[in-house]
Each structure stands twice: as structure tokens, then as C-alpha cells.
Amino acid sequence: TKSGAITNPDFEFLARQFIASTGSRIIERAKAIEETFGVKTIELVVAGFGGALIPDALREELENYFNGNKVLGIEAAALTNHETTVVNYTPQVINVAVQIVTTLKSKEQFENAIANLLSPSAKFEDGTTYRWQFGGLVPRAILIANLFDVDPVNVKNVILTTPAVDIILGDRSLPNIGTISVTLVES
């Protein structure tokens, strides 16, 4: 494993491997952005497991890990003279309103499909590749296809009214589910 950070991918990898004072890893997603706060700075945007926001004290631990802290006797993991500032990702709340023409009677499986898809932790079927990237796009077509996939035989039509357009995530954003409104129309 790596023990020091030089490149942005190094910072991202080491953030995900970091063991906090809690005794466990706390970072699921990380994105390093150079020179946000001036020359020789790294902004490390982080998301906890399941899209959790990281508390101040744990972000400070991660900063001490990268920057070092002589008072606490912590050697810097950053091998360059960059100062690392750790910030939480920005949850991009996405509300969903949809009408589904189907023979199915329960909304729960559709609500679960939406909630699982619009999670910062959502992955493709390979189980390793994250579906959503910082600064990426959340296409309506993916939401619609995901709902058809709940039961391709019994779902006849999906009418997505919210969101009305594809969602563009900010550079520091990942999707988070807002309110879900599913209306079933018997076919």
C-alpha cells in the first residue's frame, strides 16, 4: 500500500484507506482538487460511507494525517509541501415524482430502486465502479430505465415528471435522494 501522497490519486487513495481514531475507515469517496485555496494547496472533498457527512473532528484528523502535526507527533503523509484542507462533499438533493403504469400493486420496490440509484454510494452491476462522479450528470433516462428494470414484464410505462431535466452535479457534489412520490396506475 502507499504510505505517502504526491499526486491527486494518491491523496484520494490514502483518504479512503485512512483509519480514524474510531478504529475504522470513514471515507468512501474522495476527490482531490489542486490550488483551490491558493498555490500549494489541496482541497480534499470527501464523502463517508452511504453518503454520510464527516464530522469536523474526523476531518481534522484526516488533515493532520496529510499535513502532519508536530505537537501531536504526526508525520505528514503528503510528500510534497502542499497544505491539505478536507471538506465534505455537497449533497445534491434530487426529488423524484413519477407515475408508473404497471400491474404491480406495491410502490415500495420502486421507491427502493430510486433511493438505491440516487445514493452517493451507488455502483454499477460490477460492484466496484461508482455510478455517479463528482461533477457528473444524472440523466433522466437512467432513472426511467432503472424503474423499468424493477419488473420489465409488468412495467408498461414510466412517466417521470420530477426531475424535469437531467441533473448536472457540481464539482464537489454527489446525488442524494430527496422526496420520492410514486403513483401506480393499473394497466
Q: Where are these predicted regions, by residue range?
A:
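An aromatic-glycine-centered, glycine-rich loop/turn in mixed alpha/beta architecture
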Residues: 87, 107-187
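Carbohydrate-recognition loop of C-type lectin domains
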Residues: 2-136
